[in-house]
């Protein structure tokens, strides 16, 4: 019963006690120096990091962006399959337009004059045979070259494989040409047009800056030293800035990233808001894991012979895909974040006294004396009762 009463008294004291501040001036160089040093750190943090570096007085918005590209350049090839041939933008840009990216054909394996007919399958552990019984009629291997006819035929003088119904002659399993067929692609150029918007601030801009005119665009090529504002880029320079070799990358293909960053302080003149370009390779280039390297796909060009037979030229194309990625953030003065950060700074300054009190009452030699001076307990009615006497 007594424990219950004691517990109730403790709860009552906690609920009805009133705490008020008491100013205690401690004349100590150590404590004073610690107090001012801690205050200086808080002020430096609020002014230096929050206000100056992080621009805590600004409201921010993220960028909205659209990107279009236009590639130009001519390449000449001379192969046994196609002979001497000129390649222009309609030949090597596949597809003509993509969302925020473009693909440039740099190398290929060409198989000409394919028709729907029967031929021996390419030799693999699953396709080699010794008799017709090894070749199931109608079998369709997803990784094979066609539908089997049920016959085992000669692929070469020493190898037999199952006959398939497919586009014949089949594509040969060979490595891509080295050096690449379209080695001249290194000198192709691309015009990147980027329009950005910060809707919160109703701010619009594009990477073709106001100081750029049509005559300048006809001859400029991006260079960090001489033409940092030019939106026309040489493909070899893009790959080179990523510390890659274009001719090596063009053999098997790959993926490059063109990064455009718009970080704009809208409290400053609009002419200061300009794009910053960086380039990097995005696909994995690991010498210890070079299985299925690069970037490639197949496409075909169809036509009919004079006798009406449908024929196609199959191209296994290797190339470089360029992904254009836009990042950015804009800031502009706003009273609300300014007041919020000022309030947070004042709250941090209030913590300085708490820290100094804790150090004084915990680590100082005269901590007990300071504690007696710091806290005074006054009972209600007790003082009035003593005064009446």
UniProtKB/Swiss-Prot annotation:
The chain crosses the membrane at residues 37-57, 344-364. ATP binds at residues 70, 72, 189, 191, 296, 298, 316. GO terms for molecular function: ATP binding; ATP-gated ion channel activity; CTP binding; extracellularly ATP-gated monoatomic cation channel activity; identical protein binding; ligand-gated monoatomic ion channel activity; purine nucleotide binding; purinergic nucleotide receptor activity. Disulfide bonds join 119-168, 129-152, 135-162, 220-230, 264-273. Signal peptide: none annotated. Keywords: ATP-binding, Cell membrane, Disulfide bond, Glycoprotein, Ion channel, Ion transport, Ligand-gated ion channel, Lysosome, Membrane, Nucleotide-binding, Receptor, Transmembrane, Transmembrane helix, Transport. Pfam families: P2X_receptor. It is found in: Cell membrane; Lysosome membrane. InterPro entries: P2X4_purnocptor, P2X_extracellular_dom_sf, P2X_purnocptor, P2X_RECEPTOR_CS. Residues 1-36, 365-389 are cytoplasmic. CTP binds at residues 70, 72, 143, 189, 296, 298, 316. ATP-gated nonselective transmembrane cation channel permeable to potassium, sodium and calcium. CTP, but not GTP or UTP, functions as a weak affinity agonist for P2RX4. Activated by extracellularly released ATP, it plays multiple role in immunity and central nervous system physiology. Could also function as an ATP-gated cation channel of lysosomal membranes. NCBIfam families: P2X. This is P2X purinoceptor 4a. It comes from Danio rerio (Zebrafish).
